[in-house]
Amino acid sequence: MNVASIMDDLKRRMDGAIVAFKHELGGLRTGRASASLLEPLTVESYGSVVHINQVANISVPEPRMLFVSVWDKTMVGAVERAIRDSGLGLNPITDGTNLRIPLPELNEERRKELVKIAHHYAEQARVATRHVRRDGMDNLKKLEKDGEIGQDEAHSLSEKVQKLTDETIADIDKILAVKESEIMHV
């Protein structure tokens, strides 16, 4: 393993932590309708568990309304149950093979709870980033021990790894701040 591949791997894995964090945040309600709100939900379909978007189309016809068009009418009940039991506080209205889901206003208590969840997701992303940093540092120490790089180069590269870590954590904090303001905005 050479230095360039180590640095590329670190960058890719840290970017992956940010992508995963953004995906987690996408599932949090902000008061505006978003199809990503229902994407993490699963439903049992013919003996296997699949995501809702694999058995239905999810669209946003209005800012405070989700519309779910289920492809198979035998799945409507299961999709409705999955949405009701999701803990998102949503009550779908069934109309044939379609579900209309009005999004109620978030109260202050629920907003604070969502912010707390967002902070938890951010901390998970930071921890993942630090784990990647530790792996990178271990690889650099191994290269130095094996004599593939010198002590000065190892020190310089560890500073680059730390800088990359700091930038990634700063990006996570920026994304969190934006999401927090979205959640708290009435």
UniProtKB/Swiss-Prot annotation:
Keywords: Cytoplasm, Protein biosynthesis
Keyword Protein biosynthesis included in the entry's annotation: yes
GO molecular function, one term: ribosomal large subunit binding
A Pfam family per the record: RRF
UniProt record, GO biological process: cytoplasmic translational termination
Any one GO CC term of the record: cytosol
Localization (cell): Cytoplasm
Superkingdom in the source lineage: Bacteria
UniProt-listed InterPro entries: Ribosome_recyc_fac, Ribosome_recyc_fac_dom, RRF_sf
Function: Responsible for the release of ribosomes from messenger RNA at the termination of protein biosynthesis. May increase the efficiency of translation by recycling ribosomes from one round of translation to another.
Family, similarity comment: Belongs to the RRF family.
Protein name per its UniProtKB record: Ribosome-recycling factor
